From Swiss-Prot:
It catalyses: tRNA(Ala) + L-alanine + ATP = L-alanyl-tRNA(Ala) + AMP + diphosphate. Belongs to the class-II aminoacyl-tRNA synthetase family. One of its GO terms (cellular component) is cytosol. It is found in: Cytoplasm. Consists of three domains; the N-terminal catalytic domain, the editing domain and the C-terminal C-Ala domain. The editing domain removes incorrectly charged amino acids, while the C-Ala domain, along with tRNA(Ala), serves as a bridge to cooperatively bring together the editing and aminoacylation centers thus stimulating deacylation of misacylated tRNAs. NCBIfam families: alaS. This is Alanine--tRNA ligase. Its cofactor is Zn(2+). GO terms for biological process: alanyl-tRNA aminoacylation.
Length: 940
């Protein structure tokens, strides 16, 4: 066999199918566009699913690709086997109603043998159990019947990717690697063939004969046109062609391992040699086996994490992000076996990017953000890791205390799911403690978890158009807010209806409409559909399969199929939507210009009231950055760029730098919206004709919707005026309420902390914004922040002053002093007084103590307070009692020990506290007894 590099194999494959009239299609994102049933792109056919089912018009009938893929179903064996990876590249060729079984089989064999260099005499194939046709074709191509194996549905019926889509029987190509790769019994039994669990036969090419479409209920329906979907794992092909021991020993992955060798000081080849020694009672071999797995795990996981973050999938608490976080944590844990105690993964980003940048240039643009994100995750987990190690100690102790010798699978899964501990690491740790590991119990818990997260999400939205004859709705709304259209569908209670009557709610479909359906973040239009006295109020507009549905209720009259209606969009609302949608584009442009190309749109809401924009960015924006972004947008508004929309072939749109919305699926032709030099984006929404129409832009809030992402909420045009009017109205009310409280509770003493700010009124705000535009936005932002700061400072001063006055009143309160003395204890040498209060700080207790000592010369004062989260205690005494042996510091330490806290001080004054406030009474009582014993010599 020829020994080719990974990049050479990739190019040979793609060029072969290019010569066979296949369109070479670039890899899609790891985030499946428009497919909620998949967490990640798991196969080459994912981006082609609509083409197989006939849901979209075919741009080509033959295609080939090298697709980035991510699968975590075999995560626990990654690093242990020679072929499993979470991230891999899938080579594939596809036919959409063009060729079928014979050509697909011919291409696979020809490419494998005559171009990639596989030995035909070592190739075995499998076919579906009743696929006689495929078997006959293989035989005619020169594969003898004895090297053809029939397998059942589990092995040779593939698909769909997700819980719906194209699927069918398949045929796979295997390479016979020799009996030495087989299991103990394989060499002598003579029955070893594809399907055996040993490593002798390795599958390297799968041909799926797509004949069915599986719906979300699992039902199979014949496809209108058959198709071919093939998959050939690039890493696995390289393993075979390079004669490597594992995919990790192929040229690209071995290069990544060399980076880890350099960082760790451990040689991978030495580890491999030692790991092959007998492991029984051989600690060196056992350590080496663990280090071999560690090298492979961190090598695999850095690719998965790097490519995922590069595609905008950031670590998070749920969904896709959780998988990425888990991979980082798993790699961090395995890194400890290579002596990595500090963050290390992030250090490899630039080097790994260099390997893959020629094929995936987008990685180079995002490398800084990827590195920053990984570092933050590593630092976060290292804090969690110590907690996890403490937890495992607790669980081991619990197991031993209960008399058990087996560490439970449930406890192991707790460590796996909560702290990211791989089962093998837990097994190793508990073995050192003399415990067996419940593998079966762990697997049962793991399987339960898999069933809950099987890489698919169910969509709950009711599909009104299922089973309906589809006639696309012509959208008139780019140029007009009104127009005529005929009713072609009616729905009532989510079911087709012949008519809608007064008082009924439902949906109306017209053949033409000016109503914009929700899409691209922009909410659907509202308005009215009319015919004479028949009036339908549109409350929302949605789109399904190019059909626009008007949801609402019949206010009067009746509606039936074929009626011609006058459609009228609510103009004022649409205008605000235009302001906010165009503002969103300018905001996106500002973020990419000021923060970097790693910024990807992760979601948006365009409503009449505000805009919300989610984007990938690893850290919170500073106040300075927020102001720069806001100013950049306002400057683009001031320049009054013309807003130009045009339809272009998608490749032409990409050439002019048009920015795609993350996760969206596009056809061959796209609508592009350009705003001068500020923004060029794919977009189907409604916009202003010139940016100057927007007026002004203001950022209300910046926050995080999840790890690795940021969110900006902003307003444009009239909404800016309303925002500042509301904000200053709230500030006015806050100032008035605070000043009133200061005057009423502090009298003249509070005059210095009153808020003296001239808050602008509604008319003043409107006039200044309309006159000065963006300059006024900055002015009102600064003024509102200044007034808010004054309110905060005055509130703090008020509370401090109020507390001081309350403390002074408390310390000098005659009735409090009398009450304390009423419970005094006379020892004959001096008096002891004590009391417990609620919510008093140590200074107040000390002040009261000083006033008590003024009344008595020989006095010991023990005061305590129960506060919200703790208890505090102050003990003071006169100098005469110090000479009698009293030491307040010693007494406080005794009390605080009973409170679970600390304290101390001088002989005549000490203070402290603790969390266990429920013990305050008994602690003070004990201190009194100790003091009495010291003063009288009597034992207590």
């Amino acid at each position: 066999m020829k020994r080719q590099s990974v990049s050479e194999i990739r190019e040979i494959f793609l060029n072969y199918f290019k010569d066979k009239a296949h369109a070479v299609v670039p890899s899609s994102s790891l985030l499946p566009a428009g497919d909620p049933t998949l967490l990640f792109t798991t196969a080459g056919m994912v981006q082609f699913k609509p083409l197989f089912t006939g849901a979209v018009e075919l741009p080509y009938t033959r295609a080939t690709s090298c697709q980035k893929c991510l699968r975590t179903t075999d995560l626990e064996v990654v690093g242990k086997t020679e072929r499993h990876c979470t991230f891999f590249e899938m080579l594939g060729n596809f036919s959409f109603g063009d060729y079928f079984k014979e050509e697909a089989i011919d291409y696979a064999l020809d490419c494998s043998v005559n171009h990639l260099g596989f030995d035909k005499e070592k190739i075995w194939v499998t076919v579906y159990t009743d696929d006689d046709e495929a078997e006959k074709i293989w035989i005619t191509k020169g594969i003898p019947k004895e090297r053809i194996t029939r397998l059942g549905k589990k092995d040779n019926f593939w698909g769909p990717a997700g819980d719906s889509g194209a699927c069918g029987p398949c045929s796979e190509l295997y390479l016979d690697r020799g009996v030495e790769k087989g299991g103990p019994d394989c060499a002598t039994s003579g029955t070893c063939r594809p399907g055996c669990d040993c490593d002798r036969f390795l599958e390297f090419w799968n041909i799926v004969f797509n004949q069915f479409n599986q719906d979300t209920e699992g039902n199979l329906h014949p496809l209108k046109q058959t198709g071919i979907d093939t998959g050939s794992g690039l890493e696995r092909v390289a393993l075979l062609l390079q004669g490597a021991d594992s995919v990790y020993d192929t040229n690209e992955l071995r290069k990544i391992i060399s980076f880890y060798e350099e960082l760790s000081g451990i040689k991978y080849d030495d580890v491999i040699t030692l790991s092959k020694m007998p492991t029984q009672k051989n600690n060196t071999a056992r350590i080496a086996a663990n280090q071999k797995a560690a090298f492979r795990v961190v090598t695999d996981h850095i690719r998965s994490v790097l490519f995922s973050i590069g595609d905008g999938i950031y670590p998070d608490r749920t969904g896709r992000g959780y998988v990425i976080r888990r991979l980082i944590r798993r790699a961090t844990l395995f890194g400890r076996k290579l002596n990595f105690k500090e963050p290390f993964l992030y250090k490899l980003v630039d080097k790994v990017v260099e390997i893959y940048k020629p094929r995936y240039p987008e990685l180079g643009k995002n490398s800084a953000a990827i590195q920053k994100t990984i570092l933050a995750e590593e630092e976060l987990f290292l804090k969690t890791l110590e907690l996890g190690l403490e937890k495992i100690e607790t669980l081991v102790a619990k197991t031993k205390t209960s008399g058990k010798t087996i560490f439970s699978g449930a406890d192991a899964f707790l460590l796996y799911g909560t702290y990211g501990f791989p089962a093998e690491m837990t097994e190793e740790i508990v073995a050192e403690q003399g415990l067996d590991f419940d593998k079966k119990g762990f697997q049962e818990e793991l399987e339960k978890d898999r069933q809950l997260s099987r890489e698919s999400w169910k969509a709950n939205k009711v599909s009104l158009m299922t089973g309906q004859s589809v006639e696309k709705t012509e959208f008139l709304g780019y140029s007009s807010l009104s127009g005529k259209g005929n009713i072609i569908h009616l729905f009532n209670e989510n079911k087709p209806a012949g008519a809608l009557k007064e008082g009924q709610a439902g949906a109306i479909v017209l053949n033409k409409t000016p109503f914009y359906p929700e899409g691209g973040g922009q909410v659907g239009d509202t308005g009215f559909l009319r015919q004479g006295k028949n009036v339908f109020k549109v409350l929302d507009t949605q789109k399904e399969n190019d059909v626009i549905l008007h949801f609402g209720e019949v206010l009067s009259g009746e509606f039936s199929i074929a009626q011609e209606l006058e459609a009228e969009v609510e103009a004022a609302r649409r205008e605000r939507l235009r302001f906010h949608h165009s503002g969103t584009h300018l905001l996106n442009g500002a973020l990419r210009n000021l923060l970097g190309d790693h910024v990807l749109q992760k979601g948006s809401v365009v409503s009449p009231e505000y805009l919300r924009f989610d984007f990938s960015h690893p850290s919170a924006l500073t106040s300075k950055e927020i102001r720069k972004i806001e100013s950049w947008v306002n400057e683009s508004i001031r320049k009054n760029y013309p807003v130009v929309t045009k339809e272009l072939p998608i490749e032409d749109a990409k050439k002019i730098g048009a920015v795609a919305t993350f996760g969206e699926k596009y056809g061959d032709r796209v609508r592009v919206v350009q705003m001068g030099d500020a923004s060029v984006e794919f977009c189907g929404g409604t916009h202003v004709s010139h940016t100057g129409e927007i007026g002004y832009f203001f950022i209300k809030k910046e926050s995080s919707p999840g790890a690795g992402n940021r969110r900006i909420e902003g307003v444009c045009g009239p909404a800016v005026i309303e925002t500042f009017q509301n904000r200053f109205a709230e500030l006015t009310e806050s100032v008035q309420n605070l000043n009133l409280k200061i005057k009423s509770e502090l009298d003249n003493e509070g005059s210095k902390i009153l808020v003296n700010s001239n808050v602008p009124g509604p008319d003043e705000i409107r006039e200044k914004l309309e006159k000065e535009g963006a300059t006024a936005v900055t002015f009102f932002r600064d003024l509102s922040e200044e007034i808010a700061s004054q309110i905060e400072e005055s509130t703090s001063a008020f509370l401090k002053m109020k507390k001081s006055l309350e403390s002074r009143d408390f310390e000098n309160n005659a009735s409090v002093i009398e009450k304390v003395f009423a419970s005094s204890m006379d020892t004959g040498v001096g008096k002891i007084v004590s009391a417990i209060f609620d919510d008093k700080d140590p200074n107040s207790l000390k002040g009261l103590s000083d006033n008590l000592k003024v009344r008595e010369k020989n006095l010991l004062v023990i005061l305590g307070s129960k506060n919200a989260d703790n208890a505090s205690v102050v003990i003071t005494c006169s100098s005469q009692l110090v000479s009698k042996g009293i030491h307040c510091g010693d007494l406080v330490r005794t009390v605080c020990e009973m409170l679970g806290g600390k304290g101390g001080g001088k002989p005549d004054m000490a203070q402290g506290g603790g969390k266990e406030k429920q013990n305050l009474e008994s602690a003070i009582s004990f201190a009194i007894q100790l003091a009495k014993q010291t003063l009288t010599g009597e034992k207590v």
